[in-house]
């Protein structure tokens, strides 16, 4: 597609399988960077031939590749992913594109920010929806042990507060023996 994408190839393979199985009508991506993953998601969804929208949110759109920016099925928003206006936009898009949601969290990797993203999505995701928390492999899970509390710890904190919201898709997570989303493949109960 010609647009840079900072993702694990094995994770991207899993994501396309999840999209085909889930058939979401709305994809919510926190963390845009170049727009390569949003474009990838849009290409996969077009192959299924059903109405959909990709919403990609980032605090800065400066690095956004113009190729991705021109895609008619992607809405790029310059904002913090935890801003209440983002929740309002997701709620509106749910009305326009009813059905399943696939959410992927890959913006600020601090524990508090990821936890805030998960809490923002909590009332917006329904049973059967799918959420991936990326880069939960940092802070010693197994890489970058000195990073400090990050996405992995956010998942743990979220599950302490909301212990019955998600099941872990362990089979998908372990499929290739490596993932950037350690403990982060989550299906809403």
What annotation goes with each model-predicted range?
Residues 3-189:
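S-adenosylmethionine/decaboxylated-SAM
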